[in-house]
Design a protein with these regions (language model features):
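Short acidic low-complexity segments
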Residues: 54-66
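Beta-strand-loop-alpha-helix segment that lines the small-molecule cofactor/substrate pocket
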Residues: 69, 80-146
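N-terminal Rossmann-like dinucleotide-binding module
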Residues: 1-52
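Contiguous beta-strand/loop segments that form the cofactor/metal-binding neighborhood of enzyme cores
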Residues: 202-310, 344-357, 375-377, 389-393
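Charged, glycine/proline-rich intrinsically disordered loops and linkers
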Residues: 101-129, 236-247, 306-332
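C-terminal helix-rich "cap/oligomerization" subdomain common to oxidoreductases
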Residues: 2, 10, 71, 117, ...
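Hydrophobic residues in well-ordered beta-strands that form the structural core
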Residues: 58, 95-96, 142-144, 272, ...
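Predominantly a Rossmann-like dinucleotide-binding segment in NAD(P)-dependent oxidoreductases
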Residues: 136-251, 384
Length: 393
């Protein structure tokens, strides 16, 4: 496929679809042709297509037939169905995070707060099995769109671990901001959970990835998660929460704070915070404590650029950084936010895999380990932090 254009289609027309298309324009070394888009919200998808000069497909089937790669940029509830359809047609599936999950029993009475979390774990593991089985039978592959894996700071830490033979003893990290873009995120039946999965999947997957890197470098096999404990809270739904108007506070049946503790099979650990209660922009970081070094990966914000603005209106038409809140005073504008968060590098790597069969760092097994850990964490949180074993794939 290296000598010809790789035809690509996007499913979904929201936030994720927007940055996927933007970063596809930055892929080098592979001729990527974005053919078109399909979305359940037809007016939104039509507008998305018109703005980018691409085709608006009337059905998912028509899009899949016209392309080599399908980008799954929908709410998580639709990920499995779309990815499996693409794989069954022999196409590659770029699947946004989280890979899959549990989205309720389909009843009107479903309540994300009260249902047995063991049901979610069993259903999520079954979904993973179906997706990986479809991949095994396909000429295509699942390309898991976990941008943290490809963030420059995480890849530099990968180099340090590989070249120094480091033993990673403890990692701790966070993804947090003032609330998700997506209206559907407020409901478990669409998002598969709240902060633990929606935010926590990023630093968690980066931590799982780096332990895989360490294991391959030191022992020839990845080091996998073994057990997890967690707590979750719905802080903006507390009876006494005072809404000052700065945080999203319309969540229906999901958590807005989580703390997850992972124990790996070698006894080392990782702690992941995730929340919707942090002002001042996105707070994304991962710190690594190893036997021979310490690294802090500052994904967002970072201090590559700092700017002081005395009057808010001066920066009215200037993008500073995602979810900054105010542009007045000292800020840390991201000179290239997509680059620091790994989006273009992710797409570049995926299309090297598609076109030239190069090794894939963020694959379905890493995604499966993340989902297995996350839903085991929900089982733990239901028991107020009891340790739960993790099935590793």
């Amino acid at each position: 496929m290296d000598s010809q254009a790789v035809r690509t289609g996007i499913v979904g027309a929201g936030f994720a679809a927007t940055f996927h298309h933007a970063c596809l324009q930055r892929v080098h070394g592979t001729n990527v042709e974005v053919v078109g888009v399909f979305g359940a919200d037809r007016p939104q998808a039509a507008q998305y297509a018109e703005r980018r000069g691409i085709r608006h497909f009337a059905s998912l089937r028509e899009l899949i037939e016209a392309v080599d790669v399908v980008h799954v940029c929908t709410p998580p509830v639709a990920h499995e169905e779309i990815a499996v359809a693409a794989l069954e047609a022999g196409k590659f599936a770029v699947v946004e995070k989280p890979l899959t999950g549990y989205f309720g029993d389909g009843s009107e009475a479903f309540d994300g707060d009260t249902f047995p979390k063991g049901d979610a774990l069993a259903a999520a593991l079954a979904s993973i099995e179906r997706m990986r089985a479809a991949e095994a039978d396909s000429a295509g592959r699942i390309l898991y769109a976990e941008n943290w894996v490809y963030a420059p700071s995480i890849q530099k830490e990968r180099e340090i671990i590989e070249k120094t033979g480091a033993q990673v003893l403890w990692m701790h990290g966070e993804e947090a901001h003032s609330g998700s873009h997506a209206a559907t995120y407020a409901y478990w039946k669409y998002s598969g959970g709240g902060s633990l999965i929606g935010k926590g999947c990023h630093p968690l997957t980066a931590a799982l990835y780096l332990k895989c890197v360490e294991g391959r470098a030191r022992n020839g096999r990845p080091i996998r998660p073994k057990a997890v404990s967690a707590r979750t809270h719905a802080l903006t739904r507390l009876k006494d929460f005072q809404d000052a108007g700065h945080l999203r506070a319309d969540y229906v049946d999901i958590e807005d704070f989580s703390l997850t503790h992972v124990v790996f099979e070698d006894g080392t650990i990782a702690d992941v915070y995730a929340s919707e209660i942090i002002l001042g922009g996105i707070h994304n970081w991962l710190e690594i404590a190893a036997n021979n070094h310490r690294t802090i990966c500052r994904i967002n914000p970072n201090n590559a650029m700092e700017s002081y603005n005395p009057v808010e209106e001066y920066f009215d038409d200037i993008y500073v950084v995602e979810k900054i809140g105010t542009k007045q005073g000292w800020t840390q504008p991201s000179a290239d936010e997509d680059h620091f968060t790994g989006y273009p590098q992710e797409m570049e790597a995926f299309y090297r895999t598609v076109a030239r069969d190069e090794p894939l760092e963020s694959d379905s097994r890493l995604a499966a380990d993340a989902i297995s850990t996350i839903y085991s964490a929900y089982v733990s949180a239901e028991s107020r932090g009891a340790e739960v074993p993790v099935k590793a794939f």
